[in-house]
Amino acid sequence: MARRRAFPAFALRLWSILPCLLLLRADAGQPPEESLYLWIDAHQARVLIGFEEDILIVSEGKMAPFTHDFRKAQQRMPAIPVNIHSMNFTWQAAGQAEYFYEFLSLRSLDKGIMADPTVNVPLLGTVPHKASVVQVGFPCLGKQDGVAAFEVNVIVMNSEGNTILRTPQNAIFFKTCQQAECPGGCRNGGFCNERRVCECPDGFYGPHCEKALCIPRCMNGGLCVTPGFCICPPGFYGVNCDKANCSTTCFNGGTCFYPGKCICPPGLEGEQCELSKCPQPCRNGGKCIGKSKCKCPKGYQGDLCSKPVCEPGCGAHGTCHEPNKCQCREGWHGRHCNKRYGASLMHAPRPAGAGLERHTPSLKKAEDRRDPPESNYIW
């Protein structure tokens, strides 16, 4: 790996904005053959201090000269400026050597101003062999102006368990935070974070936390004013304004769904479901299910359920008089009107003066069989 140059002329500026991991120190007796590297890449350096060059912090396990005297540096070290929210460091274990790290402490000492520092890697792990970024974040809460003190304590060991690098014990760093101002302010207990965005408490949302969240949502134009509480418009009530307060009654099983409006069952219409869609009433127990359309009970058919059904019909010599009852024409009888009177006596001698016997129509019960239904008959 190519060596990166250290820049002693930048030391004072680095102390003012890079106080955390730059204060790593090497343990006494560190072996010279270690292959651990830590640096700030050119892009991050340009963002932080305006110079686009890599800034070396640790090379072959050894600290850059400008990071050695921590106590003197801490005495003159100002707080991290308001506009610096995080810093990126790049590290790498070159060759085959294995290094293990542990963040022993990430703690804010002024939690009303800044939350605990954050890192984008596990708190315990191995230094990667491929150059990788470690980001340390300084999360100001935006609730008030002030300077927050915090700790970042990390240790790096080799595969034999020897400490290679560590932050000094009881090292305290500082971050300047500012009370954020969100345009329009934050309502309902929300607070403006350092990005000037309102963070809303549970149950509220919106750019200013001005909207309450009701589950289920308010219906029929209801307004959610606090979490779970709807103000209903006139004519509605219920937890989520789902019920209508009808001033009129819905007849015939209709249901009021809006003030003055009813949902009518099939076959009925009108503002109060008082009108049938069938101009003439359905007969024999039939029910109106649409405009001029009846649903007939078993045994009847027709537009108005006025025609009885005989199963299996009355043949050519009878008519269906009642459900399953045939009325036979003169001279015929039987369940289906298919038997003729006197058919067996046609060739027998008749008494003198005797005439043909006239029979009155008779009612006979038919067997079970269905006739084709009419086109508008619904079984």
Swiss-Prot record:
Specify the glycosylation sites in chain numbering. Answer: N88, N245
Q: Which PANTHER family match?
A: EGF-LIKE-DOMAIN, MULTIPLE 7, 8 (PTHR14949), WNT INHIBITORY FACTOR 1 (PTHR14949:SF32)
Q: Which Pfam families match?
A: EGF_2 (PF07974), EGF_DL_JAG (PF21700), hEGF (PF12661), WIF (PF02019)
**InterPro entries, from UniProt?**
Dev_Signal_Modulators, EGF-like_CS, EGF-like_dom, EGF_extracell, WIF, WIF_sf, Wnt-inh
Native organism? Mus musculus
The cysteines joined by S-S bonds are C140-C177, C182-C192, C186-C198, C200-C209, C214-C224, C218-C230, C232-C241, C246-C256, C250-C262, C278-C288, C282-C294, C296-C305, C310-C320, C314-C326, C328-C337
> Ranges of Basic and acidic residues compositional bias?
356-373
UniProt keyword list: Developmental protein, Disulfide bond, EGF-like domain, Glycoprotein, Repeat, Secreted, Signal, Wnt signaling pathway
Looking up PROSITE patterns in the UniProt record yields: EGF_1 (PS00022), EGF_2 (PS01186), EGF_3 (PS50026), WIF (PS50814)
Q: Where is the WIF domain?
A: 38-177
Gene Ontology BP terms: negative regulation of Wnt signaling pathway; positive regulation of fat cell differentiation; Wnt signaling pathway
- Which SMART domains does this chain map to? EGF (SM00181), WIF (SM00469)
According to UniProt, the name of this protein is: Wnt inhibitory factor 1
Domain EGF-like, by residue range, is 178-210, 211-242, 243-271, 274-306, 307-338
